[in-house]
Amino acid sequence: MQTSKSSLAALTLGAIGVVYGDIGTSVLYAVKEVFGSGHVPFTHANVYGVLSVLFWTLTVIVSLKYVVLVLRADNHGEGGLIAMLALASQAVKDRPRLRGWLLGLGIFGTSLFYGDGVITPAISVLSAIEGLEVVSPHFGKAVIPLTLVVLFGLFAVQKRGTAGVGRYFGPVTLVWFFTIAALGVPHIVGHPEILGALSPHHALGFILGNPGISFIILGAVVLCVTGAEALYADLGHFGKRPIRLAWFSVAMPALTINYFGQGALLLAEPSAVKNPFYMMAPDWALVPLVVLATMATVIASQALITGAFSVTKQVIQLGYLPRLNIQHTSVRETGQIYLPFVNWSLFVAIVLAVVMFRNSSNLAAAYGIAVTLDMLITTVLTFFVIRYGWGYPLALCVATTGFFFVVDLAFFSSNLLKLLQGGWFPLMIGGLVFTLMMTWKRGRELLNDKLREDSIGLQDFLASVQANPPMRVDGTAVFLSAEAGVVPNALLHNLKHNKVLHRQNLFVTVRYHETPWIGLDQRLQVAPLGGDCWQVTVNYGFKNELDLPSALRLMHGRGCELETMSTSYFLSRDVVVPTIGSGMAPWREKLFAQMHHNASGVAAFLHLPSNAVVELGSKVEI
């Protein structure tokens, strides 16, 4: 029991650092942007109304939607939009048109994650360092350079992994939550009447009394739930109970106290609206607070970067992006990975955002559209999971998800007003990533169709080979093929040029499934073909670590004994040549050909030993 309690405490502390770092730093800018927009007349009633709207936004979107409902939709213990997409896809697998529509919707939502991933670190780190302007206006010119230095340092250390410093994320973020709560308490004690804003009637009164203003400021209110989707995305790392415990015992109380402390400060000192978070602190605490806030925002950004690596790897394994260079940064934790291309692409986009928008208020205009659209997509997918996957009554599913859909739609609609002020930026990034994903998926389909058209049946080919057997050499040859049952091009080229066949031959097809994990008992499907040849299908989930040699070692005892030193892997490297009238627009064909050319090699992706790989090339017109 003691071990169980200590494990729960450790997981809860970890969840505080990774899951709630982002939403925990929203106190830096949420209240400032709501009142700083100039849309809300500064009255006591409006302060109560806005605080009530902030509190009930946290309650409805985070506590009810994500913590209570969405966390239940785990896919073999895993969460995140891709896990939800896989659940929804499986739930409607007997409805192919609906399934295709949901897959497109889910992939679009995944693309938007990258748009959010650019804005969130930029606004978080920038707003933390802007605290220096409260210390002294003379620091104003240093804010952007310091922000860029911090961001560069953050991205530069990614290749070393986070195993060493990751243990401090939870404690530092816990200190942050205690600090923001401590900042709010004295101001609430000075104006305890502010706690009356906990009542929903203040939120309803504000919305009904000022419908136009309320609709507009929802675009700023949504800042209080930055990172809410991380609750679900990190489900597989921490589990439901630690995530829920961390929210209700630490994050939610600390956020509420701080927001209400900022509200109490505004009641007493309306001029504090220019930066209410930092102006809650005494002068002596400002510099340490800026340092702590910067550390907290770096941790929050780190969690998002790690999430980008993980999501990209999953999308690659689902077949929506080309293979990329994936480096493992820890010998103990297989999930700790580093993708150089993703890392530096994010960095360039974030630097561009900081330089273009200049301050956190301008970045606040860019934030919201992508994340609220993501929330809408999550709600839609949740409906199909609980209706068709869990079999709940239609009326209950519509009532539950319909309520959240209306809330999400209100926030999304409000954020559309910010489209020209900066909302276009994350949408542009998401749209670009979505175009790349769909082009790659369609291009792979066309490529596989072409290879299938030109292919020879494996059984017939082996029969002809056995009738006129070539010379056999010792060892095992592993031929990789995208399709089972057809002759791999690498085998044809090997016979053409080398005129030999190995003693044992495995024809291997790797399959990626819409489930997070596939156990070792389901890893291989083996079919003997005769003549010491086998057809092998290797199955992976989208979160499994890919290691083909390890998987093939499971062949022992199935009539095929693999010796590592005498096994060779034969791969076909297809050079794609775009042609007119293939099923894609010419520019997409050229884009696919370039993506295919730049994709990292199969050998590294499947962890094949480099000294045992033979790669043979061929041209394919699509």
Swiss-Prot record:
It catalyses: K(+)(in) + H(+)(in) = K(+)(out) + H(+)(out). One of its GO terms (molecular function) is symporter activity. It is a multi-pass membrane protein. InterPro entries: K+_transporter, K_trans_C, K_trans_N, Kup. The keyword Cell membrane applies. Keywords: Cell inner membrane, Cell membrane, Ion transport, Membrane, Potassium, Potassium transport, Symport, Transmembrane, Transmembrane helix, Transport. One of its GO terms (cellular component) is plasma membrane. It is found in: Cell inner membrane. It comes from the Bacteria. The keyword Ion transport applies. Belongs to the HAK/KUP transporter (TC 2.A.72) family. Transport of potassium into the cell. Likely operates as a K(+):H(+) symporter. This is Probable potassium transport system protein Kup. It comes from Acidovorax ebreus (strain TPSY). The gene is kup.
